[in-house]
Amino acid sequence: MPQAFLLGSIHEPAGALMEPQPCPGSLAESFLEEELRLNAELSQLQFSEPVGIIYNPVEYAWEPHRNYVTRYCQGPKEVLFLGMNPGPFGMAQTGVPFGEVSMVRDWLGIVGPVLTPPQEHPKRPVLGLECPQSEVSGARFWGFFRNLCGQPEVFFHHCFVHNLCPLLFLAPSGRNLTPAELPAKQREQLLGICDAALCRQVQLLGVRLVVGVGRLAEQRARRALAGLMPEVQVEGLLHPSPRNPQANKGWEAVAKERLNELGLLPLLLK
């Protein structure tokens, strides 16, 4: 029988480390509370092979994550850019979605201590803002908006970036596992909880348009919102991953054309 991994036993909710607490400040505080609620619900799930270790950067990278939400989620948002889940060299290191280290530190201006996950894979160490490896997806994503908007405040005036699922899954070898690679029953349990949380988060922020970054994020957003919030528009954006051949042919140009099609460029150039 494959060993079942109980998320709560792999990754205790930061108790001995530092119990996450939302920061004061209305909307940001409420958003953080929703994330902690999601963490609590996910901690009850069990995962078996091929999952070896689970990282939750919303817990061990709580300080920079809280700083990100507090700084850039101070008011309602018209547009939510939705990623799927953390990457090993992005949010897993910094607590910020698509969180390539230099972009997080130097453009977004987010800092804060990153703790060590309770169980860490030797091939995927968490080094926080000292991580020397760049996440290509995050560098492309935030680099594009840096070039387009100039200052992060311009981007975040109308937009926010969030991941549907806060968990990073690693195989025993250390290989990154996407949620799509999980056993079907476990995947649907996981994403069902995340879908419900997304509906609450979209309602909280007053979002009118969700842009799924990558096909899976777009599909899940459509599925989550169609029944409960059909008034929210859902569209897709090509994922900037280097594993995506189309993205390697000039993702920035593709992204700009897509945002123009969606009528978003005026919001991002103010």
UniProtKB/Swiss-Prot annotation:
Q: Which UniProt keywords apply?
A: DNA damage, DNA repair, DNA-binding, Hydrolase, Nucleus
Task: Tell me the impact of changing N163D.
Answer: Impaired the damage-excising activity for U/G, hoU/G, hmU/A and fU/A. No cytosine-excising activity for C/G, C/A, C/T and C/C. hoC-excising activity for hoC/A, hoC/T and hoC/C
**Annotated phenotype, changing N85A:** Markedly impaired damage-excising activity for U/G, hoU/G, hmU/A and fU/A. No cytosine-excising activity for C/G, C/A, C/T and C/C
The enzyme's E.C. designation = 3.2.2.-
Q: Would the keyword DNA-binding turn up in this protein's UniProt record?
A: yes
Region (DNA-binding), start-end ranges: 173-187
> What's the family?
Belongs to the uracil-DNA glycosylase (UDG) superfamily. SMUG1 family.
Its protein name is: Single-strand selective monofunctional uracil DNA glycosylase
What organism does the UniProt record list as the source?
Answer: Homo sapiens (Human)
Phylogenetic classification of the source organism: Eukaryota, Metazoa, Chordata, Craniata, Vertebrata
Identify the gene encoding this protein.
Answer: SMUG1
